[in-house]
Amino acid sequence: MTGLLDGKRILVSGIITDSSIAFHIARVAQEQGAQLVLTGFDRLRLIQRITDRLPAKAPLLELDVQNEEHLASLAGRVTEAIGAGNKLDGVVHSIGFMPQTGMGINPFFDAPYADVSKGIHISAYSYASMAKALLPIMNPGGSIVGMDFDPSRAMPAYNWMTVAKSALESVNRFVAREAGKYGVRSNLVAAGPIRTLAMSAIVGGALGEEAGAQIQLLEEGWDQRAPIGWNMKDATPVAKTVCALLSDWLPATTGDIIYADGGAHTQLL
């Protein structure tokens, strides 16, 4: 039986731990036959140990999305990793960051612009940066997928990260216009809350007890609202949604947002 992604070469960014959504995307993609290239930032030795837990070995490249030299050399380094003459079929952007001043119990109005702009650069602008760097080495019919969290309402403790996700949604629509010139699609997956390392830290009080309590209420309310329920400890449904977008089965879908949240975004209570 062939896998959904057999023979496809896919770059996955954003693995930090084995609780990262990106880790589960990489795992499911490999289970479906994909050949991966991974990117990581900063703690590469630690990330390498984490990625060694995947079903198959994959090259790990350093990528700081704020570093213009890293971005300028990315296509060449990827080509070296996958072999001359080969191109990518998919790119996964699972990168997000906002300084603590822009999240948690810190008042929304008190976040310094320098911190907010850094968060928006990493969480939203970098989606366009990566697309620009990699589109020239992508095959027609390819797919770029970014990770979203529904920013249509003000979320407790998320503050400026919610604003960054709103920016990401707009960036995606423009990336879709540019990617279309290469015959490539661009979409986001809006996931429900997943207990990643960062989320667990917030619930544990890393951004203050009040913020932790608010996020815990958000998680509990999500499962109650979702018509089919929501398991915040299981990232596999989200990973499968991403892999569906990376496959050939949604060839006419681009510039869009696909929800993988148990349907909670459709329900008021």
UniProtKB/Swiss-Prot annotation:
Pathway: Lipid metabolism; mycolic acid biosynthesis. The record marks F149 as: May act as an intermediate that passes the hydride ion from NADH to the substrate. It comes from the Bacteria. InterPro entries: Enoyl-ACP_Rdtase_NADH, Mycobact_enoyl-ACP_red, NAD(P)-bd_dom_sf, SDR_fam. Is phosphorylated on Thr-266 in vivo. In vitro, can be phosphorylated by multiple Ser/Thr protein kinases (STPK) such as PknA, PknB, PknE, PknH and PknL. Phosphorylation decreases enzymatic activity. Pfam families: adh_short_C2. This is Enoyl-[acyl-carrier-protein] reductase [NADH]. It comes from Mycobacterium tuberculosis (strain ATCC 25618 / H37Rv). The lineage of its organism: Bacteria, Bacillati, Actinomycetota, Actinomycetes, Mycobacteriales. The gene is inhA.
